[in-house]
């Protein structure tokens, strides 16, 4: 618990990561100013209002990354800021003006609001694995010193290229701004986020992670060599880094690496009713995982609590409780899942944040095409 109640702002508060982060902050006694695009839309914010301690510690604020000065009022008087929100539109015909500039300018606008407030002691940014390993030749292990290759991305313009560019440019611009203005800035880099959720829609990251259950083959290549973090671990890591005075720089937050075959092996006996495949094209026992090292985070004293099995089981059980997964699967129920997921707002990214991004719009929010470099599709969802 915080020794003295602080006031923090959470952007993108209605989304998969944002809403869980708000919940954990409220539990710890923080006053939380949650920014959303439309506080009056109860369909999008009721799950926040229903949280424990919300009546006494939570307030909703209207803000939009595309509007200059939009966050000034929400941030004024805050002790800290958690920037989770991000614009996205993988079908944009003008990605420079509709995706890249809003991402970078939105980031800088929030940072300017922090400087203007003169009360913000730390700014924690939810970055993306897409800022780390989008490059032509993949390494076995990635850490915080790695950055995606913008020249390679711009030359290939693979699926989702504007997202990789926007997140990378935004974080680099943030580091420059923070150094110039003396703002205490930390970025946390999650991989594919899996776990239970309190939002009313199916998080796209779970559409990807649970593709062996739904037998959605278009997603298999994304988790062929996957990296994962439990939603609760990720949100606790946000708060941990905010509270640790010695924290500095970038922090990868990824607890497990696994191939799709590994995932299948523990899902099959646990959920025999789903008939999870036992083999996948191009995948065998010799396929090695690609690691995103969280050593810097764990060396600070942070401990991951959840196993790979736990994060998947909790995801599945939440999806079943909310009606996003049937008790057992038939071809008809698979079709129903795809139809439900057509309703996800992939163009505006409403309520979507790092770890829950659809990779391209099809009936399930992702294409089956292979990108120009291994693992690129993975980073669109992390």
Swiss-Prot record:
One of its GO terms (cellular component) is extrinsic component of endoplasmic reticulum membrane. The gene is DFRA. Bifunctional enzyme involved in flavonoid metabolism. Keywords: Flavonoid biosynthesis, NADP, Oxidoreductase. The keyword NADP applies. GO terms for biological process: anthocyanin-containing compound biosynthetic process. Transmembrane segments: none annotated. Belongs to the NAD(P)-dependent epimerase/dehydratase family. Dihydroflavonol-4-reductase subfamily. It catalyses: a (2R,3S,4S)-leucoanthocyanidin + NADP(+) = a (2R,3R)-dihydroflavonol + NADPH + H(+); (2S)-flavan-4-ol + NADP(+) = (2S)-flavanone + NADPH + H(+). This is Dihydroflavonol 4-reductase. Pathway: Pigment biosynthesis; anthocyanin biosynthesis. One of its GO terms (molecular function) is flavanone 4-reductase activity. InterPro entries: Epimerase_deHydtase, NAD(P)-bd_dom_sf, NAD(P)_dehydrat-like. It is an enzyme of class 1 (oxidoreductase). Its EC number is 1.1.1.219, 1.1.1.234.
């Amino acid at each position: 618990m915080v020794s003295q109640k602080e006031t923090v702002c959470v952007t993108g508060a209605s989304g998969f990561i944002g809403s869980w982060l708000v919940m954990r902050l409220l539990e710890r006694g923080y006053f939380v100013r949650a920014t959303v695009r439309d506080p009056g839309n109860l369909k999008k914010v009721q799950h926040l209002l229903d949280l424990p301690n919300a009546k006494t510690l939570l307030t909703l604020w209207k803000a939009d990354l595309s509007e200059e000065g939009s966050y000034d009022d929400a941030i004024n008087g805050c002790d800290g800021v958690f920037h989770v929100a991000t614009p996205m539109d993988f079908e944009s015909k003008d990605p420079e003006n509709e995706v890249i500039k809003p991402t970078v300018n939105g980031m800088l606008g929030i940072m300017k609001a922090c400087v203007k407030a003169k009360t913000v002691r730390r700014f924690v940014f939810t970055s993306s694995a897409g800022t780390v390993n989008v490059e032509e030749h993949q390494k076995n292990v990635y850490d915080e010193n790695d950055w995606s290759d913008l020249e390679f991305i711009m030359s290939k313009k693979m699926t989702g290229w504007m997202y990789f560019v926007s997140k990378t440019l935004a974080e680099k611009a943030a580091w420059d701004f923070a150094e110039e203005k003396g703002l205490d800035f930390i970025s946390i880099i999650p991989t594919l986020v899996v776990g239970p959720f309190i939002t009313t829609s199916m998080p796209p990251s779970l559409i990807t992670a649970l593709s062996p259950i739904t037998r959605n083959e278009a997603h298999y290549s994304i988790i062929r060599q996957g990296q994962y973090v439990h939603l609760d671990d990720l949100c606790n890591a946000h708060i941990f880094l905010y509270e640790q005075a010695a924290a500095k720089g970038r922090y990868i937050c990824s607890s497990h690496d696994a191939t799709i075959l590994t995932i299948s092996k523990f899902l099959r006996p646990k959920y025999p009713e789903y008939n999870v495949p036992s083999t996948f094209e191009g995948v065998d026992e010799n396929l090695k995982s690609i690691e995103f090292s969280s050593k810097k985070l764990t060396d600070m004293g942070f401990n991951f609590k959840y196993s790979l099995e736990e994060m998947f089981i909790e995801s599945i059980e939440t999806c079943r409780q909310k009606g996003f997964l049937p008790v057992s699967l038939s071809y008809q129920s698979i079709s129903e899942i795809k139809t439900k997921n057509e309703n996800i707002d992939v163009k505006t990214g409403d309520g979507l944040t790092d770890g829950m991004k659809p990779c391209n719009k099809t009936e399930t929010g992702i294409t089956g095409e292979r990108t120009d470099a291994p693992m690129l599709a993975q980073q669109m969802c992390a």
